């Protein structure tokens, strides 16, 4: 490793956790992460073409491990960032918890925030399971993966106050989502309404982020101190708007249009299994 570079294990094993080291590590890897995301797009569509005339792979075992691993990681991350955010609430106040970074990026919540950024590359693996098992690949899926990963890497070293809430909400929703996927992959019968509510939670986190961003934006234009930058602020706002539109459309197509065809089909499947 070239002199001056910070390794993953150096950040992981430094006690107490050093946010400055983690920022250096992400800064060193963000360009590689960007090119990985570009390669990801090429690979998934190339692989999709290759799989056109092939039978789907039976990946039950690997999928079980994958979903269980991400469910455990997301749950631990949710717990760590929940305690970190509660500390900010009680020590600095509700609004300050997203206006300024405080101590959130230090300690256990800081370590999991750093791991959160890195995990966005690992989550590309979700798409491989979709393609190799010949499940439908939606634009929403890969677009969301690519944009979230690049935003996470690019904005990490900027110390954005509102990223504390984004990280916490994403961890929390993912802990439930991957827990649901894990149960499904293990063959556990899960009520159809749970999938519907997970989509609702995903949309809700984007809506909450909008309120936070609007407040931070108001404070910024009125000359008050905020931990934000114009470039990353607009990147985040436009990204979140696109997510509300895409996830909202998915919700409409799945659970409202035609009386909720997807939802009703899943319920019928449940009855057949029972």
Curated annotation (Swiss-Prot):
Pfam families with a match to the protein in the record: ELO
Recorded metabolic or biological pathway in which this protein acts: Lipid metabolism; fatty acid biosynthesis
EC identifiers of the protein: 2.3.1.-
Keyword Iron in annotation: no
Membrane topology recorded in Swiss-Prot or TrEMBL: Multi-pass membrane protein
Family recorded in the similarity comment: Belongs to the ELO family.
Protein name: Long chain fatty acid elongase 6
Natural source organism: Caenorhabditis elegans
Gene behind the chain: elo-6
């Amino acid at each position: 490793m070239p002199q001056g570079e910070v390794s993953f294990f150096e950040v992981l094993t430094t006690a107490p956790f050093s946010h400055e080291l983690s920022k250096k590590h992400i800064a060193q890897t963000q360009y590689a992460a960007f090119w990985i995301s570009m390669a990801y797009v090429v690979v998934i569509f190339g692989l999709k073409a290759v799989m056109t005339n092939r039978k789907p792979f039976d990946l039950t075992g690997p999928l079980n491990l994958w979903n269980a691993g991400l469910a455990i990681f997301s749950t631990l991350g949710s717990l760590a960032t929940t305690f970190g955010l509660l500390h900010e609430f009680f020590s600095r106040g509700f609004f300050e918890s997203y206006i300024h970074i405080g101590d959130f990026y230090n300690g256990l919540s800081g370590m999991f925030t750093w791991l959160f950024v890195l995990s966005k590359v690992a989550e590309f693996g979700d798409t491989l399971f979709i393609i190799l098992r010949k499940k439908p690949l939606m634009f929403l899926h890969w677009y969301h993966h690519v944009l979230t990963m690049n935003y996470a890497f690019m904005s990490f070293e900027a110390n954005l106050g509102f990223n504390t809430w984004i990280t916490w909400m994403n961890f929390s929703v993912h802990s439930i989502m991957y827990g649901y996927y894990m149960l499904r992959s293990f063959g556990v019968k899960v009520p159809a309404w749970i999938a519907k509510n997970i989509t609702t939670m995903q949309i809700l986190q984007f809506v909450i982020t909008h309120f936070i961003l609007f407040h931070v934006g108001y404070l910024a234009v009125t000359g008050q101190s905020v931990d934000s930058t114009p470039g990353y602020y607009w990147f985040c706002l436009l990204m979140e708007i696109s997510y509300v539109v895409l996830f909202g459309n998915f919700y409409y197509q799945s659970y409202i249009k035609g009386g909720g065809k997807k939802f009703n089909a899943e319920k019928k499947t449940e009855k057949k299994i029972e």
